[in-house]
Amino acid sequence: SSEIIEARQVADRPKQKGCGWTNAVRISEAGGAKFSAGPLSCQAAAAFALWVQYEVQPAAERIFGQRVRSIQNFGTYSCRNIIGSRFWKNRRSEHATANAIDVAKFRLADGTQISVLRDWNGKGKKAEFLRAVNKGGCRFFRVTLGPDFNRAHRDHFHFDRGQLWSCR
């Protein structure tokens, strides 16, 4: 489709104990890639769609000569604190307000799968692609974390639109 994003609105879940959301959507497609995820804040959904359209697809075409068909994620909403950091452990994660997404795998048009866990430390095209799209997340998200940040992120990219700023 020519749309950058296909999504439907999700009913608000009023915040309780720092968890919940307003103005969230469920994305079914972004930048031409199929996608299935839980509720995501409108600003995070917009950032995600722009990232797929202007970073993921161009990188896939440049490196593999084809587009990404689908993107797998580990989730959007989760009522919890930040994981993997002693300093931030008492702060609510952006996942607690559906303002973050964890991306784990990409599938190309020919069925080739690219996994953050398996391919990040490789030497070939898959690693090149993952490093390009991880860095590209910094254009659209306030926080971009990947396997080089800490062990908690060894198998996914964390992207969010919260108050903090970090490109790792």
Regions found by a protein language model. Name each.
Residues I4-A7, F48-V52, C79-S85, E94, ...:
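A short linear-motif detector with a strong N-terminal bias
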Residues Q16-T22, C79-S85, H156-H158:
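Short, solvent-exposed polar/charged micro-motifs at secondary-structure junctions
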Residues R62-A98:
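Active-site-adjacent substructure of cysteine-protease-like catalytic cores
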Residues Q16, Q57-P58, K89-R168:
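Catalytic cores and adjacent binding grooves of peptidoglycan-active enzymes
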Residues S1-Q72:
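Active-site acidic/histidine clusters and adjacent loop/turn architecture
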Residues G32, G75-T76, N121, L164:
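Residues that form or immediately flank small-molecule/cofactor binding pockets and catalytic motifs
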Residues S1, C42-A45, Q72-C79, F87, ...:
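N-terminal start-of-chain detector that recognizes signal peptides
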